[in-house]
Amino acid sequence: MSKIVLEAKDVYKHFTDGKSTVEVIKGLSLKIAAGEFVSIVGASGSGKSTLLHILGGLDQPTQGQVFLNEQRFDNLGEAERGFKRNQYLGFVYQFHHLLPEFSALENVAMPLMLRADTNYKEVKQQAEHLLDRVGLSHRLTHKPGELSGGERQRVALARALVARPAVMLADEPTGNLDRKTAFGIFELLSDLKQEFNMAMLIVTHDEQLAQSADSILHMQDGLWVDHS
């Protein structure tokens, strides 16, 4: 049986606005094994992005537990959670969040360049390899403003992979792309998941795109729902 690399146990998330409390996540549990590709599908406001932020250590649950690589993750201090994120997780968002003043190569290399033990030559080679893998070997020196939307998202994918994460978390990674480009990105994600033997969790509102995953979870009003 494959190792469980990401797990949520009975997770709740409440937000308080003045005297009122809004329940966004209502007791969700989830297990993702190494090499598994899971899609979470739900409409806007269903709580799927909030759950992804909790699983990625960007937010903390009101109640419940999160485990990363079989170790408790949600109760760590902010600095230690940040260290674990950089060590085990890769993130891709609907908006690419590339730094506009840096080239594609520099953007991809950035996560490793920030580490104390950086070997600059090796980092550059690794970034070049990943850009080649996502079909952008001819765009190494181009800045984000010189790339198409699909190309920018491919750079973001390469950047998320450069640290060889155990888990890739993607929040509506094709939300800003046309249909053909979106399917191409999902196909690439599936291929990269196999190549790097990493777990992948993607949230999307698009049922058709989600079919690429090994399993699909449907979310509504902060709960899993049966969609059979």
Curated annotation (Swiss-Prot):
PROSITE patterns: ABC_TRANSPORTER_1, ABC_TRANSPORTER_2, LOLD
Record flagged with keyword Cytoplasm: no
Enzyme class: translocase
Signal peptide region: none
Residue ranges constituting the ABC transporter domain according to the UniProt record: 6-225
Family membership: Belongs to the ABC transporter superfamily. Lipoprotein translocase (TC 3.A.1.125) family.
Protein name: Lipoprotein-releasing system ATP-binding protein LolD
Phylogenetic classification of the source organism: Bacteria, Pseudomonadati, Pseudomonadota, Gammaproteobacteria, Moraxellales
